[in-house]
Amino acid sequence: VLTLYDFIRSHPFPQKWLVDKLKFYDDKQNLNENIFVQVLFDYARMAVIHCLQLTENSVKMIQEIEKIKLAYEETLLYDKELLNELKSTLENKNWNEISRALKIIKFVALKRLVGYSDDPVKLKVIQNRKDVKEIIKNLTRLFFQSEEQCFEDLKTLRQIISELFELVKDFEERLDLAKNEKNVVDFGDLEHLTLKLLVCKTENGFEKTEIARSLSQQFEFVMVDEYQDTNEAQDLIFRSISDDERNLFVVGDVKQSIYGFRQAMPEIFLRRKQKYKLFDANKEIYPAKIILDKNFRSRKGILGATNFIFSQLMSNSIGEIEYNQEEKLSFGASYDEKNDSDVEIKILDISESEDDGMNVLEARCIAKIIAQMIGENYEIKSENVVRPVTYGDFCILLRSTNKHAADFVKELELCGIPSWSDTSNSFFGTAEISTILSLLKIIDNPIQDIPLLAVLVSPIFGFTPDDLSEIRVTDKEVPLYFALKKQAKLGDKKCRNFLLEIDNYRRLAATLPSDKLIQQIYDKTGYTAVVQAMKEGQLRLNNLRLLIEYARNYEASGYKGLTGFIRFVSRLEEQKADIAASNSISEGANVVKIMSIHRSKGLEFPICILANCSRKFNKDVGDILLHPALGPGIKLLDYENMRKYTTFQRDAIKLDIDKKAMSEELRVLYVAM
């Protein structure tokens, strides 16, 4: 409910969005005209066209080798005939016909071919055919249900989606009441309150209010940068305060739209770009577009490599824009000529090093490259001065630093190379913070085995494995806290002292604010002195002080008590909130920077190393998917067989989400290069 609530707030009229999406579940509509089915039809048509291309390529390849041609041509031509028939069926856009055609399609086996086991043509043809059969198998699964079964699912889905939407509406009303009582708003509220002042919803869209009309006369220009990252709500705000868009000046690059996870909609900017004609200074007809193709940051070789790669990869289908002459980068800077290349591609062979992870091997390779360039005094030109390269001139770019940066930091450190990562350590993941949070959790509720165990073995209390075995042997069936109490009654002083200390903290928690309680824990346990004796002790001490600061801010916000603070921290952990731990090295120091591509956007470094390029895409496989145009996609429950199953509606949504995700991944690569 919360996820859907957050998602629809990027739309200018969230309630209308819910009403519109529910209309997609009309079970009286012709199934072939259903919006989800249309998505599946389009996908299937493109998939079969791709199969035909693979098959035609195979037919062309075998023409050069007579024996392979004699063995394979007849079967491949038969495949082509089958695929053409399927393509014709798909063009009729009839669910039952397509479903039947896919169920009866049969591929015959290729004839046996002796003596060509390692021939690259043979291997490529076999692989192409495997790919074709896999695609057809996937299409058969997508269209496996009958029309009647689809309507049954549609009816069930309508009931569930309707209930979900009602829950979201109810949640919004209650949340708004709670916010009003506390006199607070969030960023989403500010957007929607602004929209309420500026526009009124009508049957055909919206109309400006008097306030908007008055404001639009006060601005000579409305200028917006990074417009490719706007959402529908923001776009409507900008349009409403402009003079019917005549004075609206927007700057953006669809190829650099990489914030889909924040509901950025590059298609908003793209529609403008496609609609407007090129600016003509002699006619001055508005709206118009100006192409800013000059690049003043990069050397010519980098731009050439970028243009070459993306002219092969980026299209309207994947990337959401055709990488044509208008989109190509033009060299605009002034750099001295140099002998070595501007771009190098390193291919790492991991076949002989399977014991180490790919991350570690890649990090080790990069560390050697940096060490070599530093050792050879590789020269760069910076601020019109030629000088030897330093550590601070290098930046390692990763798609995500959260999971992978640690390996790179470690390998660089082993080579004596100082580095800084934009995440370094997660605040909640540091040993000192994890220990104190576990202690707070058991002060709030001691019947929690995992945090209790973490506290017992921590430097604060120092229970050994033998101690724990003794405690657990006392009673294996009860929670650990009750086993501790039994052991204390048997005369175990260590257990008794621990329980007395926890009881004391529990009494303090009833009267003290959370920040004061944490300070009491530090003072009574001497934990601050303990962490200072550890490696990087000052950093650990800084983290403990940070925790008190977060607790103080929590109390100052109007919320009170330990229980609430623990819930607040748990939510931050669940949401993977970007809370950085203290770091001994600052971003501005002379160190190698390890950054996410998102973080590096807009920054400049003399030498960039783009790593982790072999990483697989992280496709969303959750039970519920959210699509800005198609709405939520959900799985259904088969109570009889106790299983979840997907539906044609969710399949359609997942296909389009995957396509958009691949487009965004391609744009992330573009930003990195």
Pin down the residues of each PLM region.
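C-terminal accessory regions
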Residues: I460-G462, R472, G588-V591, M642-M673
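Flexible hinge/switch segments at interdomain interfaces of large molecular machines
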Residues: K169, F187-E191, K283, G332-D349, ...
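Mobile, glycine-enriched helix-loop/loop "lid" segments at the mouths of ligand-binding/catalytic clefts
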Residues: S570, N618-Q649
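Short glycine/proline-rich turn/loop motifs
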Residues: F144-K155, F171-L177, E181, A288, ...
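P-loop NTPase Walker
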Residues: A71-E74, E81-N84, S88, N92, ...
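Conserved motor-region signature of P-loop NTPase helicases/translocases
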Residues: V1-L4, P12-K23, D27-Q38, D42, ...
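Conserved helicase/translocase P-loop NTPase motor core
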Residues: L164-E220, A233-Q234, C365-N384
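Conserved ATP-driven helicase/translocase motor core recognized via long
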Residues: L2-V185, C200, A406, G416-I417, ...
